[in-house]
Curated annotation (Swiss-Prot):
The keyword Transmembrane does not apply. Mg(2+) binds at D155, N185, I187. Binds 1 Mg(2+) ion per subunit. Can also utilize other divalent metal cations, such as Ca(2+), Mn(2+) and Co(2+). PROSITE patterns: TRANSKETOLASE_1, TRANSKETOLASE_2. Pfam families: Transket_pyr, Transketolase_C_1, Transketolase_N. Homodimer. Its cofactor is Mg(2+); Ca(2+); Mn(2+); Co(2+). The keyword Manganese does not apply. This is Transketolase 1. Its EC number is 2.2.1.1. GO terms for cellular component: cytosol.
């Protein structure tokens, strides 16, 4: 039987070799954390390489994602569908082993990591989802949801502000099945961290309410094992402080930043092999080492035991079992489509001139009755974002059966936690803040788009229309930023009907995040036929049309649709042929076929005006260089909203005059 150190050295060898072959990468962290990984993966982690989607598996997140050869080595050695050739293709085009772990490439990768601090935050979301799902479905004698979330993280993760947001909330909510390992190696890219990171990290986490196990030798298997056992037994989230040597095994580069982010070089790898007593050529693992790492039989046994538990649960609680399966499969209720469409039709038949943020709350109220999988929240703005509805019940440390999270003022943390909730499964997460403060959360939304996962954000107070709070709170460029993000759904509805359609599509869209952008001020409901209501889902549609071919097209979104309609009425009265296009979602419109887009925006009608209280430049792709844009080109001002709209040209008079200039 191989020693634990020898089994850990298999990780070190593969990590050295993979980085060397790619001629780029980070060997230091995998070599430093190999002993911890060996103990965790071989003695504690419940997983099944043959079924990486097993619902009750433990989750493992490598928050210090630059050390990706660590997780690739673990997956390969444990028996996942990740071959030695995949490891040889590390960092190569179209490989399953990209430079940072990416969700959806190699089986067993739970989340995309690399932007430091977001992995630990995703893990908080996963642990939160586990605790909530357990509270909703477990019964006495039937602990059907019962798993841990383990995280590796480095000094960089802890320096990032998002780690404070996430770990503070994790302590408050008592996420006892979250166990984090701090790779305390004292090194970052610039060198020894004491010059820029001298926090007392154990005391920091104690202040959060975590269970802290300090000063664990990260190269002592028995000490690591004892720490994990203690962590699992404690009802609080645990930080295991593991003192490690970066690049352990490299005789001349370990303990320095020289091994952090560059290949060791052939000479140093040979020296490391000799130092570690690893006598095998590059990418060669002996059969006995493979045999001791192989987790397939043990994993199949663990999953089979859980399947038997689930069968007993289903026999005792058939309704709950069916509902849990539906939610874990990401399926919507059977009556969803019919009921949701009826809700939208009823809204069109019963006009209400309300703020679209209120329309959003009404949509939550209507759809929420069908969706026990909703897991809502707001970054301390629930009364403003209007994200709570009659069925909302707040999560508390001692009662996790609810469906609403008070995230506090933590926009970035909230959004990345929601990514973890979505990745875990069983929930449709939505969060909220003012549109302006999506800036704090932007990278987590980008990660959701990159991972192709569901993350619904309610962004209210969407323009200068919020008024007196001024330019610090008035978004200008944010809508364009969201729209320009690949695989992001962005909706800015003009009334309660478009708002409900946007919500319906966001709930249905499992492979992308959605930004729902809503107004503070009241908006007039527009008249529509049933066909027009159907066309809302296409992102852009003809709301008002001219008799005969239009000579001018007004394109508007959100609060400016009402303005476009009024201007069109005046121009029509003066004999102009004007079409109004409501375009709540440019990305949805862009996905329509060419025939539909041509029908809405005929290419031979070049007199076009886009009207939106956001950055003007975005709209040239729709109006062309010969068109006009009534939008924002500066930041806003502090003043009542009506004065600001007038000052910045969002008036019927300005639209009419601009149209006449264009048609002259």
């Amino acid at each position: 039987m191989s020693s634990r150190k020898h089994l850990a050295n298999a990780i070190r060898a593969l990590s050295m070799d993979g980085v060397q072959q790619a001629n780029s990468g980070h060997p230091g962290a995998p070599m430093g954390m190999a002993d911890i990984a060996e103990v965790l993966w071989r003695s504690h982690l419940n997983h099944n390489p043959a079924n990486p989607e097993w619902a009750d598996r433990d989750r493992f997140v490598l928050s210090n994602g630059h050390g990706s050869m660590l997780i690739y080595s673990l997956l390969h050695l444990s028996g996942y569908e990740l071959s030695i050739d995949d490891l040889k293709n590390f960092r190569q085009l179209h490989s399953k082993t990209p430079g940072h772990p990416e969700y959806g490439y190699a089986p067993g990768i739970e989340t995309t990591t690399g932007p430091l601090g977001q992995g630990i935050t995703n893990a908080v979301g996963m642990a939160l989802a586990e605790k909530a799902l357990a509270a909703q479905f477990n019964k006495e004698g039937h602990d059907i949801i019962d798993h841990f979330t383990y995280v590796f993280m480095g000094d960089g993760c802890l320096m990032e502000g998002i780690s404070h947001e996430a770990c503070s909330l994790a302590g408050t909510l008592g996420l006892g099945k979250l166990i984090a390992f701090w790779d305390d190696n004292g090194i970052s890219i610039d060198g020894h961290v004491e010059g820029w990171f001298s926090d007392d990290t154990p005391k920091r986490f104690e202040a959060y309410g975590w269970h802290v196990i300090p000063a664990v030798d990260g190269h002592d298997s028995d000490a690591i094992n004892a720490a994990i056992e203690a962590a699992k037994a404690d009802p609080r989230p645990t930080l295991i402080c593991t003192k490690t040597i970066i690049g352990f095994g490299s005789p001349n580069k370990s303990g320095s930043h020289d091994c952090h982010g560059a290949p060791l070089g052939a000479e140093e790898i040979a020296a490391a092999r000799e130092f570690l007593g690893w006598e095998h050529p590059a990418f060669e693992i002996p059969a006995d080492v493979y045999a001791e790492w192989d987790a397939k039989a043990a994993g199949a046994e663990k999953e089979a035991a859980w399947n038997a538990k689930f069968e007993a649960y289903a026999a005792a609680y058939p309704t709950e079992a069916a509902e849990l399966k539906r939610r874990l499969n990401g399926e919507l209720p059977a009556e969803w489509e019919e009921k949701a469409n009826q809700i939208i039709a009823d809204l069109q038949a019963n006009p209400a001139n309300i703020a679209s943020r209120k329309a959003s709350q009404n949509a939550l109220e209507a759809f929420g009755q069908m969706l026990p999988e909703f897991m809502g929240g707001s970054a301390d703005l629930a009364p403003s974002n209007l994200t709570m509805w009659s069925g909302s019940k707040s999560l508390e440390a001692n009662d996790f059966s609810g469906n609403y999270i008070h995230y506090g003022v933590r926009e970035f943390g909230m959004t990345a936690i929601m990514n973890g909730i979505a990745l875990h499964g069983g929930f449709v997460p939505y969060g909220a803040t003012f549109l302006m403060f999506m800036e704090y959360a932007r990278n987590a939304m980008r990660m959701a788009a990159l991972m192709k996962i569901q993350n619904i954000q309610v962004y209210t107070h969407d323009s200068i229309g919020l008024g007196e709070d001024g330019p610090t709170h008035q978004p200008v460029e944010q809508m364009a930023s969201l729209r320009l993000t690949p695989n992001m759904n962005t909706w800015r509805p003009c009334d309660q009907v478009e708002s409900a359609v946007a919500w319906k599509l966001a709930i249905e869209r499992k492979d992308a995040p959605t930004a729902l952008i809503f107004s503070r001020q009241n908006l007039a409901q527009q008249e529509r036929t049933a066909e027009q209501v159907t066309d809302i889902a296409k992102g852009g549609y003809i709301l008002k049309d001219s008799d005969g071919k239009p000579e001018l097209i007004l394109i508007a979104t959100g609060s400016e649709v009402e303005l476009a309609v009024k201007a069109a009425e005046q121009l029509t009265a003066e004999g102009k042929k004007v079409r109004v296009v409501s375009m709540p979602s440019t990305d949805a419109f862009d996905k329509q076929d060419a025939a539909y887009r041509e029908a809405v925006l005929p290419s031979d009608v070049t007199a076009r005006i886009a009207i939106e209280a956001g950055i003007a430049d975005f709209w040239y792709k729709y109006v062309g260089f010969d068109g006009r844009i009534i939008g924002m080109t500066t930041f806003g001002e502090s003043a009542p909203a009506d004065q600001l709209f007038e000052m910045f040209g969002f008036t019927v008079e300005n639209v009419v005059n601009t149209a006449k200039e264009l048609l002259a």
